[in-house]
């Protein structure tokens, strides 16, 4: 299945992308190469290959949950243009 330049242009329009003629040519070529590769992968015999989600076995790789000391409030607000009672003072928006 090959994409036409018109189809790539249509998808670009849906995505609100403004593409030059050179971009259209390049993306059409690149997308067709990707689709060709996917088509070749479809032809592979995978009946003896077990389904996998990851190449490497990952099991809940997380860091230890710990509380680290943070910076003192005085040091944090020291660089603020305006400060009031230890809090940043910002212009009213509403």
From Swiss-Prot:
GO terms, biological process: glutaminyl-tRNAGln biosynthesis via transamidation; regulation of translational fidelity; translation
* Cysteine-cysteine disulfides: none
* Designated gene of the protein: gatC
| EC numbers, comma separated | 6.3.5.-
Q: Which InterPro entries match?
A: Asp/Glu-ADT_sf_sub_c, GatC
Indicate whether Nucleotidyltransferase appears among the record's keywords. no
Q: Which Gene3D superfamilies match?
A: Glu-tRNAGln amidotransferase C subunit, N-terminal domain (1.10.20.60)
Catalysed reaction(s) here are: L-glutamyl-tRNA(Gln) + L-glutamine + ATP + H2O = L-glutaminyl-tRNA(Gln) + L-glutamate + ADP + phosphate + H(+); L-aspartyl-tRNA(Asn) + L-glutamine + ATP + H2O = L-asparaginyl-tRNA(Asn) + L-glutamate + ADP + phosphate + 2 H(+)
PANTHER family, per database record? GLUTAMYL-TRNA(GLN) AMIDOTRANSFERASE SUBUNIT C, MITOCHONDRIAL
Question: What GO annotations for molecular function exist for this entry?
Answer: asparaginyl-tRNA synthase (glutamine-hydrolyzing) activity; ATP binding; glutaminyl-tRNA synthase (glutamine-hydrolyzing) activity
Q: Which family does it belong to?
A: Belongs to the GatC family.
Q: What class of enzyme is it?
A: ligase
Q: Cite the entry's keywords alphabetically.
A: ATP-binding, Ligase, Nucleotide-binding, Protein biosynthesis
Q: What is this protein called?
A: Aspartyl/glutamyl-tRNA(Asn/Gln) amidotransferase subunit C
- Species name: Heliobacterium modesticaldum (strain ATCC 51547 / Ice1)
Q: State how it assembles.
A: Heterotrimer of A, B and C subunits.
Role according to the record: Allows the formation of correctly charged Asn-tRNA(Asn) or Gln-tRNA(Gln) through the transamidation of misacylated Asp-tRNA(Asn) or Glu-tRNA(Gln) in organisms which lack either or both of asparaginyl-tRNA or glutaminyl-tRNA synthetases. The reaction takes place in the presence of glutamine and ATP through an activated phospho-Asp-tRNA(Asn) or phospho-Glu-tRNA(Gln).
């Amino acid at each position: 299945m090959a994409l036409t330049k018109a189809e790539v242009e249509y998808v670009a329009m849906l995505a609100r992308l403004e593409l030059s003629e050179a971009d259209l040519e390049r993306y059409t070529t690149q997308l067709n190469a990707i689709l060709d590769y996917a088509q070749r992968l479809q032809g592979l015999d995978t009946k003896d290959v077990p389904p996998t989600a990851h190449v490497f076995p990952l099991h809940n790789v997380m860091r230890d949950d710990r509380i680290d000391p943070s910076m003192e409030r005085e040091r944090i607000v020291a660089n603020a243009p305006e400060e009031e009672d230890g809090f940043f003072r910002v212009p009213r928006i509403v």
